[in-house]
Design a protein with these regions (language model features):
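Short glycine/threonine-rich catalytic loop with a Thr-x-Gly-x-Asp
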Residues: 126
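Gly/charged, well-structured mid-domain segments that form the phosphate/adenylate-handling core
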Residues: 152
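A hydrophobic, small-residue-rich beta->alpha segment in the mid-to-C-terminal subdomain
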Residues: 168-171
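Hydrophobic alpha-helical segments within soluble ligand-binding/sensing domains
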Residues: 129-132
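Nucleotide and nucleotide-moiety/phosphate-recognizing core
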Residues: 8, 16-123, 134-148, 156-159, ...
Length: 204
């Protein structure tokens, strides 16, 4: 009887883990005007992942949505259409709508302080001056959400706003996109193994 109960507990725990949903949010600004800009790297990465899974984005409330599956885990890809500085409204809505836990929500953003193409994963932390991350923290009333920052480099001689809203040159574009496969693997790891293991394996 004890063994039978233990078996059912094991099955319940394993099934519950598989049934967990995940929200992967790529930050950016909607509209052709911002296509291919450094600030929209989150959008571009999600487009890459969506295409890899032979899925498509559909316009929905407060964003574009794509639903995929990764080894039995249900994954919602979200590109907010609220503009970068108001991303929190979209993130909060879809977390509540799909009943997704904070620990299962990964926010992808650009980062001026990281070299081009480098990534940094964190389980929590400050916004680091990123308005999108700041607004999400305000909407969720917490900064304890996992995030993946992608380095876009920096130009000390140019205005930062002009730089992040500028378009990647061909060399930068190639460097960034050559890393997309590795970055998408880090997201798979987050979904399957959690943020701690993923940080240990992918932070570079």
């Amino acid at each position: 009887m004890i063994c039978q109960n233990a078996f059912f507990i094991f099955v319940y725990i394993k099934t519950s883990a598989i049934m967990d949903k995940f929200l992967i949010v790529g930050l950016g600004n909607p509209g052709e005007k911002y296509y291919n800009t450094r600030h929209n790297i989150g959008f571009e990465l999600l487009d890459f992942i969506c295409k890899k899974h032979e899925s498509e984005f559909e316009t929905n409330r407060l964003g574009q949505i794509s639903k995929i599956s990764i080894k039995g885990r249900k994954v919602l890809l979200l590109k907010p259409n609220t503009f970068m500085n108001l991303s929190g409204k979209s993130v909060k809505y879809w977390m509540l709508q799909e009943n997704i836990k904070l620990k299962n929500t990964l926010i992808i953003s650009d980062d001026l302080n990281l070299p081009l193409g480098k990534i940094r994963l964190r389980a929590k932390g400050s916004s680091g001056g990123h308005n999108g991350l700041e607004n999400i923290g305000q909407a969720l009333n917490s900064l304890e959400y996992p995030r993946l920052r992608i380095g876009i480099g920096n130009d000390k001689n140019s205005n930062q706003i002009d730089f992040v809203l500028g378009i990647f040159n061909s060399n930068e574009y190639d460097i960034i996109h050559s890393n997309f496969d590795l970055i998408s693997k880090s997201i798979n790891s987050f979904i399957l193994s959690g943020i701690t293991i993923t940080m240990n394996n992918f932070n570079n």
